[in-house]
Amino acid sequence: MVPCTLLLLLAAALAPTQTRAGPHSLRYFVTAVSRPGLGEPRYMEVGYVDDTEFVRFDSDAENPRYEPRARWMEQEGPEYWERETQKAKGNEQSFRVDLRTLLGYYNQSKGGSHTIQVISGCEVGSDGRLLRGYQQYAYDGCDYIALNEDLKTWTAADMAALITKHKWEQAGEAERLRAYLEGTCVEWLRRYLKNGNATLLRTDSPKAHVTHHSRPEDKVTLRCWALGFYPADITLTWQLNGEELIQDMELVETRPAGDGTFQKWASVVVPLGKEQYYTCHVYHQGLPEPLTLRWEPPPSTVSNMATVAVLVVLGAAIVTGAVVAFVMKMRRRNTGGKGGDYALAPGSQTSDLSLPDCKVMVHDPHSLA
């Protein structure tokens, strides 16, 4: 077991449309935190179906009870909430004892704050059958003990956890837990998926874009954003000329957006002027095909000014050309040139028709009267 991995799992989890077949998961995250001098330990249970929080219990609430966190859970009757509340309160008492027990296992004083965390749940495939079950414990942010994939044996992270392992082996704890994971857990997951299908079975595709950030020494950071997607599983990669940049890429954990969707970004540092050689690739089940993005530089102010100047010059040239053409036409007509329809009026002189007079006539339509 790798130390301190469970804490990262907990942090990542807490943190319309197409439909999808699976897999799906039912998970419970449990946290008990001692706080010497401030009363009893705080105890919390948070339930997730896939990436959606649907129930919560908090011992610090004004009236600690199991509460719905998704609208579709309002279908459950009062007996459900009473039963789950009593179970949570029983678990709360057990974890208070566990916190005191672990102080002895690790030879720790009673003056400090300590934390027990648990992740427990099951995952089913598109056919509704169990793919895997799990139950893992952490103490003060590091792995303590975990049920193995065979659902029959345990792995202890240190000597203190070996004490717990021996006790659970003698009590047949793995057999009891396996029955829950293969039976009760799967049954409730199917029920929740049915009740919340409009929300849980949806797929929201990511909205992606690339931003540009200046750095010293002729470097820039390109950051690829994926926003508003569900479910949370997504992959972002950067490539240079078709080759993935794994070691040079900075990647943040997928984060809840607060509206039931998720967000994530990945960045890479590149030489200034070489941005167009780098591409971001986004993979998500809500996309018909992966997205490929480059940084698109906005039109510069200089470029805009040049464009305006060109348009002004062209416009002036067109107007001038039209005026000149009109003047020449009028001159041909007044001098009896080929194609002229007008004869000179008696006493008129061709030298009296000048360009300035024509300009006035062109720009002042009322002079035609």
From Swiss-Prot:
The keyword RNA-binding does not apply. Residues 204-295 are annotated as: Alpha-3. The modification Phosphoserine is found at S351, S354. Pfam families: C1-set (PF07654), MHC_I (PF00129), MHC_I_C (PF06623). Residues 22-111 are annotated as: Alpha-1. Residues 296-305 are annotated as: Connecting peptide. Its main location: membrane. It is a single-pass type I membrane protein. Heterodimer of an alpha chain and a beta chain (beta-2-microglobulin). This is H-2 class I histocompatibility antigen, K-B alpha chain. It comes from Mus musculus (Mouse). The gene is H2-K1.
